[in-house]
Amino acid sequence: MSTWKSIVDKVIEAPVVTSFTSIGPALRSRLDDWTSLDSYDLIGRRIVLTGGTSGLGLAAAERFTSLGATLLVVGRSRDKTERICAGLPGPGTATAVIADLGDFDQVRAAANEILDLGGADTLIHNAGALTADRRTNAAGVEATIASQVVGPHLMTTLLLPSLSEAAPGRVITMASGGMYAAGLTVRQLQMDDDEYGGSEQYARAKRAQVTMNELWATKVSPAKVVFHAMHPGWADTPGVEASLPTFRKVMGPLLRSADQGADTLVWLVADDEATTTSGDFWLDRRRRPIHKLPTTKKTDTPERRAQLWEYVEQLAGTRS
C-alpha cells in the first residue's frame, strides 16, 4: 500500500463523520480501486450466515447467492427465513436453518443440522440487535451477550472441524463501531437491571466479540481457519431505524446503504486477502485498530482477555 494512499486513508479515518458514513466507501473505493464484488465466483462455497433476513445480512445474502454460493441462512422465524431464502437470486441456492442464537440448545441443534446438510467453509456471525430492555435466556444469560457473544462462540466451536476442512475456513464477525466507546469487561459484561442501557450493553457485547475474534486467531492455526471481525460504519438498516430513530433522523442523508455496509463482509468471504492473516478488524477493506481511546485500551489486558475466554467457555458449556 503506497504511503500517500495510507496518509489519505488516515485523513478520512480521523473524523468519524467521513469514516463511518457513506462518504467513507465513496472515497475509499476510488482511493484503493476496489475490485467489483460482481467479479468474484463463489460457486462451490458453502456459507453459513446468521441474521440474513434483513438489513446488512440480507444485502450480503443476495450477493452470496448471486455469486453462486450455497447459503445456509440461520434465522429465528421459520416463515420469514424460508420466504427470504426462496426469494434470493441464483445461480446459488439458499436453505433456512431455524434457531435463536441466544438459545444454546437451539444453537446446538442448528449446528447439527448444518453438519447434516454438508457443513460449511465459511461461518458469518451477523445476527444481533440493540434492545432497550434487559432480558435473559433460559440459562439466565443476558440476551445481548447470549445471542452475540456466547451463542456465536458455541456455534464456532461446534462447526470448527467442518470449517477446518476448507484449509482455511473463514469465520467472520459483524461487529460495530459502537464498540470503540466500550472498554473490555468481564465482571460487568452482563449489565444488571439497575444499570442497564441497551446501547451500552450492545457496545460491551461488540467489544467482547472483537476480542474473542483475536483470541480465536491465537488458538487456531490460520492454515485451518482464519478469523476476522469488521464493522459496517453507520448504515441505514431496519435495526437502526427501530433502535436509534433520533440518530437515523439526524444522520439519515449520510448513512450508508445496506449494500455499502455489507461490502467488506462480502469481500472478506470472497477475496484471497482474508486468508493471508487472521484476527484482524476491518472497515472498508482495510485493517483497523481495535481501540481509538486510551481509556478503552487500558482495560484490554492479557489477564482480562484470558478471563473473558474462560467466562464465555463456561457460559457456552464448551470448556474442556
Predicted regions and their residues:
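Short alpha-helix in the Rossmann-fold core of NAD(P)-dependent oxidoreductases
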Residues: 134, 145-159, 172, 205-206, ...
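Non-catalytic terminal and boundary segments that flank Rossmann-like NAD(P)-dependent oxidoreductase
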Residues: 1-48, 183, 298-320
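C-terminal helical subdomain
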Residues: 6-13, 21-26, 205, 251-293, ...
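The beta1-alpha1 cofactor-binding region of Rossmann-like NAD(H)/NADP(H)-dependent oxidoreductases
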Residues: 78, 96-112
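Rossmann-fold scaffold of SDR-type NAD(P)-dependent oxidoreductases
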Residues: 50, 120-128, 148, 172-176, ...
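Catalytic loop of short-chain dehydrogenase/reductase
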Residues: 128-138, 142, 164-224, 231-251
